[in-house]
């Protein structure tokens, strides 16, 4: 398992407007992660415990 910013089909991370932790936690759960939250510095969803084969970004939106 790994931690990171999950990406959409265009290789951009998921934006979480309004700092919506519930949105990110659900999104991460749908991707089989343990949990997730909205990282306020970048306004992007960050997941903990993603499967190793799930694409992620290490930094930046795209």
UniProtKB/Swiss-Prot annotation:
Any one Pfam family here would be: Toxin_3
Q: Which InterPro entries match?
A: LCN-type_CS_alpha_beta_dom (IPR044062), Scorpion_toxin-like (IPR003614), Scorpion_toxin-like_sf (IPR036574), Scorpion_toxinL (IPR018218), Scorpion_toxinL/defensin (IPR002061)
Disulfide bridge partners, by residue number: 12-62, 16-38, 24-45, 28-47
Q: In which tissues is it expressed?
A: Expressed by the venom gland.
Query: Which SMART domains does this one have?
Result: Knot1
Listed GO molecular functions?
sodium channel inhibitor activity; toxin activity
- Residues of the LCN-type CS-alpha/beta domain: 2-62
**For this UniProt entry, what's an example GO CC term?**
extracellular region
| GO biological process terms held by the UniProt record | defense response
According to its UniProt entry, what is the function of this protein?
Alpha toxins bind voltage-independently at site-3 of sodium channels (Nav) and inhibit the inactivation of the activated channels, thereby blocking neuronal transmission. Is lethal to mice.
Concerning its family, UniProt says: Belongs to the long (4 C-C) scorpion toxin superfamily. Sodium channel inhibitor family. Alpha subfamily.
Q: What is known of its domains?
A: Has the structural arrangement of an alpha-helix connected to antiparallel beta-sheets by disulfide bonds (CS-alpha/beta).
This chain belongs to which protein, by name? Answer: Toxin Tb3
Q: Which organism is it from?
A: Tityus bahiensis (Brazilian scorpion)
